[in-house]
Curated annotation (Swiss-Prot):
Pathway: Pyrimidine metabolism; UMP biosynthesis via de novo pathway; UMP from orotate: step 1/2. It catalyses: orotidine 5'-phosphate + diphosphate = orotate + 5-phospho-alpha-D-ribose 1-diphosphate. The lineage of its organism: Bacteria, Bacillati, Bacillota, Bacillota incertae sedis, Caldicellulosiruptorales. InterPro entries: OPRT, Orotate_PRibTrfase_bac, PRibTrfase_dom, PRTase-like. One of its GO terms (molecular function) is orotate phosphoribosyltransferase activity. This is Orotate phosphoribosyltransferase.
Length: 191
C-alpha cells in the first residue's frame, strides 16, 4: 500500500485525531495517531504487519519486542508473519523492563517495534533492554514515524508512514496559548 492508502486507513478507522494532545513524550500536538483504533481490526493488523514483514523476511529474526501497551498487537502479528517469538516490555515503577518470564538469549536477532515513533523515547528504552540481554538488534520498525525522519535511534528504522507532524514544548505551545483544552490519549503516564 502507498502512503495515501495508509492515511486513508487511519481516517476510515477514526484513528487520526485532531485537537490538542499531550503526547507520551511530554510534548503537545494538534494531531494524534491512535494506532489501537486501526489494530483493533485483525485484517488491518495483518495487512500492516505483512507490509512491514516484507522488509525483514530475509533477516532471520528470532524475536520481535515492543513496549506495552501500544506495540503488543504490532509485535505479536509481526512475529507471526516472520515466524518467530513475540515479547514485550512494560513499566514497573516507571522503568521499562522484561517481565512475565520473558528473556532474550545472547546473540538472538531482535527486531524492535513501536506503533508510533515521535521522539523515540520508548524505543530507546527497549534498545537498552535488548543490549542488557546481549541481543543483536537488526532494526527498528513501526507503523508511523511522526518525526518526519528526524529521530535518530542508532539502528535502521523502517516505518510504513513518515509524517512531519509538528510538536511543541508545553511552554511554547500555540494551542495552550489559545486556551484549547488538552487531552492525554496515550498509554503512558507523563511526569
Amino acid at each position: 500500500m502507498n502512503k495515501e492508502a495508509y492515511i486513508q486507513m487511519f481516517k476510515d478507522t477514526d484513528a487520526l485525531l485532531e485537537g490538542h494532545f499531550l503526547l507520551s513524550s511530554g510534548k503537545h500536538s494538534a494531531k494524534y495517531l491512535q494506532c489501537a483504533k486501526v489494530l483493533q481490526y485483525p485484517n488491518l493488523a495483518e495487512m500492516i504487519c505483512r507490509d512491514l514483514a516484507e522488509y525483514f523476511k530475509d533477516q532471520q529474526i528470532d524475536v520481535v519486542i515492543g513496549p506495552a501497551l501500544g506495540a503488543v498487537t504490532l509485535s505479536y502479528e509481526l512475529a507471526r508473519q516472520l515466524n518467530c517469538r513475540s515479547i514485550f516490555a512494560e513499566r514497573e515503577d516507571g522503568i521499562m523492563k522484561l517481565r512475565r518470564g520473558f528473556k532474550i538469549e545472547e546473540g538472538e536477532k531482535v527486531l524492535v517495534v513501536e506503533d508510533v515513533i515521535t521522539t523515540g523515547g520508548s524505543v530507546k528504552e527497549i534498545i537498552e533492554i535488548v543490549k542488557e540481554y546481549k541481543g543483536e538488534i537488526v532494526a527498528v520498525a513501526g507503523i508511523v514515524d511522526r518525526s518526519g525522519g528526524k529521530v535518530g535511534l542508532g539502528y535502521p528504522l523502517k516505518t510504513l508512514l513518515t509524517l512531519n507532524i509538528e510538536t511543541y514544548e508545553p511552554d511554547e505551545c500555540p494551542l495552550c496559548g489559545e486556551g484549547i483544552p488538552i487531552v492525554k490519549p496515550g498509554s503512558r503516564k507523563v511526569k
